[in-house]
């Protein structure tokens, strides 16, 4: 048996800088990961199969179009019994499906003793799959295929992730964008010596999908505001195309206290504190 952890992908920034003739949008994004996520387990079998367990399994029915099965077929489609233990909300802007696909590629590469697919095949699985396969903090550009390592390590920090229980499909959010030629981040990203310095940088940056997502799902604005109001929250913003938002904290204790308070105030929300991983 092999196992891989599918960590949540967090877009600390997400600038939409253009659109290609084929319709794909060009992005400039600072991507980090959180130490919370799904787990993929694989075992030898004659046929390819997928079982989904975990607290979020009810929201993700098994189908041939599931990214886990698509990733398995991209690896060559041998037999394997795959179990996806689902903890991340579905269609929530934190790369759950893409992280699951990347974890499947890693687990099956070990099980079958095969190399990972070429970069183009990985990108065809989804724009976030390459960065999830990378699994570390990067600057992501192009349509997701350009991954630039950061100049230095990220400062120690914690994230509180909050999802109000609504799914925000990505295509309508992009369709509702007012502009598709927004300015990118600075050419050279600074080195951040502390979580406060990182938060100050983020405050001058954007998630261009936040406004259209809020127009489609006003709960996103409520979630962001609830995070921002918690003591110790340095900045709150939506990740990806939503609806999950993150709050950035310098230390573990206020992050866990914020998560506990938010769970009490919003029992229907999905809320997780997690260390920010570089």
Swiss-Prot record:
It holds the Pfam family GHMP_kinases_N. The keyword Nuclease does not apply. The active site is at 9, 128. Its EC number is 2.7.1.148. GO terms for molecular function: 4-(cytidine 5'-diphospho)-2-C-methyl-D-erythritol kinase activity; ATP binding. GO terms for biological process: isopentenyl diphosphate biosynthetic process, methylerythritol 4-phosphate pathway; terpenoid biosynthetic process. The keyword ATP-binding applies. Pathway: Isoprenoid biosynthesis; isopentenyl diphosphate biosynthesis via DXP pathway; isopentenyl diphosphate from 1-deoxy-D-xylulose 5-phosphate: step 3/6. ATP binds at residues 89-99. It comes from the Bacteria. Keywords: ATP-binding, Isoprene biosynthesis, Kinase, Nucleotide-binding, Transferase. InterPro entries: GHMP_kinase_C_dom, GHMP_kinase_C_sf, GHMP_kinase_N_dom, IspE, Ribosomal_Su5_D2-typ_SF, Ribsml_uS5_D2-typ_fold_subgr. It catalyses: 4-CDP-2-C-methyl-D-erythritol + ATP = 4-CDP-2-C-methyl-D-erythritol 2-phosphate + ADP + H(+). Catalyzes the phosphorylation of the position 2 hydroxy group of 4-diphosphocytidyl-2C-methyl-D-erythritol. HAMAP family: IspE. Belongs to the GHMP kinase family. IspE subfamily. This is 4-diphosphocytidyl-2-C-methyl-D-erythritol kinase. It comes from Cereibacter sphaeroides (strain ATCC 17025 / ATH 2.4.3). The gene is ispE.
């Amino acid at each position: 048996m092999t196992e891989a952890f599918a960590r949540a992908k967090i877009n600390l920034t997400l600038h939409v800088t253009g659109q290609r003739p084929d319709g794909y949008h060009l992005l400039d994004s600072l991507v980090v990961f959180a130490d919370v996520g799904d787990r993929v387990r694989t075992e030898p079998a004659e046929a390819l199969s997928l079982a989904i367990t975990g607290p979020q399994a009810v929201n993700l029915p098994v189908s041939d179009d599931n990214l886990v099965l698509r990733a398995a077929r991209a690896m060559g489609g041998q037999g394997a019994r795959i179990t996806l233990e689902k903890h991340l909300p579905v269609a929530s802007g934190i790369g759950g499906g893409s992280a699951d696909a990347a974890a499947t590629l890693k687990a099956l590469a070990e099980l079958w003793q095969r190399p990972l697919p070429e970069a183009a095949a990985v990108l065809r699985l989804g724009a976030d799959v390459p960065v999830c396969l990378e699994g570390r903090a990067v600057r992501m550009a192009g349509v997701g295929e350009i991954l630039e390592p950061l100049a230095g390590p990220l400062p120690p920090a914690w994230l509180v992730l909050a999802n109000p229980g609504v799914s925000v499909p990505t295509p309508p959010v992009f369709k509702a964008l007012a502009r598709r030629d927004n300015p990118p981040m600075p050419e050279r990203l600074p080195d951040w010596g502390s979580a406060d310095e990182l938060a100050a940088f983020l405050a001058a940056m954007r998630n261009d999908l936040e406004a259209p997502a809020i127009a489609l799902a006003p709960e996103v604005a409520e979630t962001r505001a609830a995070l921002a109001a918690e003591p110790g929250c340095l900045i709150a913003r939506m990740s990806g195309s939503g609806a999950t938002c993150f709050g950035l904290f310098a230390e573990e204790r206020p992050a866990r206290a914020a998560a506990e308070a938010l769970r009490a105030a919003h029992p229907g929300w999905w809320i997780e504190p997690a260390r920010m991983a570089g």
